[in-house]
Amino acid sequence: MKLNRLTQSFILLALSSLLLLFFSSCKEDQKNFKTIEITFKKEGELSLFKAETDSLIAKYHIEIAETDYERQRGLMDRTSMKDDQAMLFIFPDVRMRSFYMKNTYIALDIIYIDDANKIVSIQKNAKPLNETSLPSKAPAKYVLEIKGGLSAQLGIAEGDRIDFSKSRNQ
């Protein structure tokens, strides 16, 4: 059976229209999705003390990361942090630690602390989104993350110590 040119054109147009309709229905709706800001959750307080004088250097409201999931997430996907806020990572054992800045948008000072609450090393001004390993110089049980540049500004050094308490509702 031979189709004339007009019929062929009509069939081609109909098939093209059906394909266009099919592919446009597969397209996702253009909705405005809002990014949910991860907010700081105060779960305790931490104080930093100078090694030589035992004088108070700074006080922080802390969010605590002590489950595997919390330690893995850390401050990832956060876009801001106040100077008096910090995250304290609590590990079940003392050993060499290493952190990196994957999916972390805030420059941080990463402070490694032993089981006697003494600072054993500091990685200053870790660059956002950088996946380079930032190891401790000595075994650590705790890791404190504060806003980048604060350890230099406040004179926080190896040998200084911390004291912290969890909030009662923890």
Please identify what each model-predicted range represents.
Residues 21-25:
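C-terminal motif of bacterial Sec signal peptides marking the signal peptidase cleavage site
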Residues 27-170:
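Compact, glycine-rich, soluble single-domain proteins
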Residues 2-14:
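Bacterial N-terminal signal peptides that target proteins for export
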